[in-house]
């Protein structure tokens, strides 16, 4: 993480975080973790969300909690998996809701959301790394301070962003967002445990595009999953 792979716009915004004492401690923790354990995603993908979606191009924010923790899944974008990897259950439910909401026929066989990121959808996990096979193993080590700062920077310096917050953890981040400047859509988490409690039928994808078009912005092509 000496030279993080991150878009220059975000590097400028997040420079105070990279230089903060907590981040030095986080780096030391990650070095020690990688000496003992396999960690995901690989180093070059840790900041992929910030690299794929420049600060001034963010139109939509989707928040996750932490990366997938099994081999080959995590590549730095929340909910997303590389092409050719089995689509995880939460993402299957996200695709089902898009198809229901928009009348699309996106197959449930691919889950790479890079095409969303390239259109201005920031796919941000609150914690950017994880130990293999141990969900949540890198929580409360400093990543949340870092990603909260990113959310706050967007909330304060930009206007008109659509924040799609699914589940109680993501919804807790609404405290950083001024709803007179931005749009906040909330629903239960798309996990199989909670999707039937209101994620299915939330119609966030059509709502998001309507909001963007009201602002004269291009809608997101949610079918761009590879």
Model-based region annotation:
Residues 4, 16-165, 169-172, 177, ...:
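A polyanion-binding, active-site-adjacent surface
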Residues 199:
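C-terminal substrate-binding/active-site "lid" region of AdoMet-derived donor-dependent transferases
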Residues 2-14:
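Generic N-terminal amphipathic, Lys/Arg-enriched alpha-helix
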């Amino acid at each position: 993480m000496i030279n993080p792979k991150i878009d220059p716009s975000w590097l400028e915004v997040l420079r105070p975080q990279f230089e903060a004492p907590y981040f030095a401690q986080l780096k030391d923790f990650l070095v020690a973790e990688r000496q003992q354990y396999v960690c995901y995603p690989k180093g070059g993908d840790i900041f992929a969300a910030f690299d794929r979606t420049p600060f001034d191009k963010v139109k939509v924010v989707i928040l996750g909690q932490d990366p997938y923790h099994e081999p080959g899944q995590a590549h730095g974008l929340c909910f997303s998996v590389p092409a050719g990897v089995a689509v995880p259950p939460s993402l299957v439910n996200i695709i089902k809701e898009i198809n229901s909401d928009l009348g699309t026929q996106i197959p449930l066989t691919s889950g790479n959301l890079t095409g969303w990121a390239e259109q201005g959808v920031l796919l941000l996990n609150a914690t950017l790394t994880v130990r293999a096979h141990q969900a949540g193993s890198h929580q409360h080590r400093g990543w949340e301070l870092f990603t909260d700062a990113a959310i706050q920077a967007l909330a304060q310096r930009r206007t008109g962003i659509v924040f799609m917050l699914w589940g109680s953890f993501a919804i807790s981040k609404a405290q950083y967002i001024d709803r007179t400047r931005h749009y906040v859509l909330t629903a239960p988490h798309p996990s199989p445990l909670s999707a039937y409690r209101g994620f299915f039928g939330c119609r966030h994808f059509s709502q998001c595009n309507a909001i963007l078009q009201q602002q004269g912005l291009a809608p997101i092509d949610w079918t761009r999953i590879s």
